[in-house]
């Protein structure tokens, strides 16, 4: 009887420990996404001391460029600054001249800045506390017709 009781207790412990295993796996995925964003071509490159100065120079340069390059993003056409692309891995703006990622992101979900085309919602987000990024973001917002929906 005692042996069966111990077996049941151990089985219950094993079943309940799956939750903690899943939490660890989710935490690893989240930390990988954060690290990927802080690489040179990610949107969080400005947070990395190694790239910070170069990213700010790239932002100043891109702010002076016209917003006239048409690119495909998740089935729609967007207009972005020339000599930039949307990074396929992080969905952030990437400067082709320097290779630095900018804190300007695109998504296929609704953000505060969104645009609906044929029933699909596209979002734009940018760090408006960094000098130059707000300028670039406003230009992209205006060129593509994104609408601010948050209050």
Positions of the model-derived regions?
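Sec-dependent bacterial lipoprotein signal peptides
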Residues: 1-20
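N-terminal targeting sequences that direct proteins away from the cytosol to non-cytosolic compartments
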Residues: 19-99, 125-151
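Short, surface-exposed polybasic-and-hydrophobic patches located at secondary-structure transitions
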Residues: 95-110
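Short hydrophobic/glycine-rich mini-motifs in sensory/regulatory modules
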Residues: 120-122
């Amino acid at each position: 009887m005692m042996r069966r009781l111990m077996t049941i207790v151990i089985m219950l412990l094993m079943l309940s420990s799956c939750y903690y295993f899943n939490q660890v796996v989710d935490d690893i995925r989240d930390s990988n996404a954060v690290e990927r964003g802080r690489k040179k071509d990610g949107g969080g490159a400005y947070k990395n001391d190694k790239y910070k100065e170069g990213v700010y120079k790239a932002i100043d340069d891109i702010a002076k460029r016209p917003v006239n390059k048409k690119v495909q993003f998740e089935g729609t056409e967007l207009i972005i600054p020339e000599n930039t692309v949307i990074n396929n891995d992080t969905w952030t703006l990437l400067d082709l001249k320097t290779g630095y990622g900018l804190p300007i992101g695109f998504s296929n979900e609704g953000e505060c800045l969104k645009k609906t085309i044929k029933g699909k919602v596209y979002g734009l987000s940018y760090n408006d506390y960094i000098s130059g990024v707000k300028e670039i973001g406003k230009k992209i917002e205006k060129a593509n017709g994104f609408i601010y929906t948050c209050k």
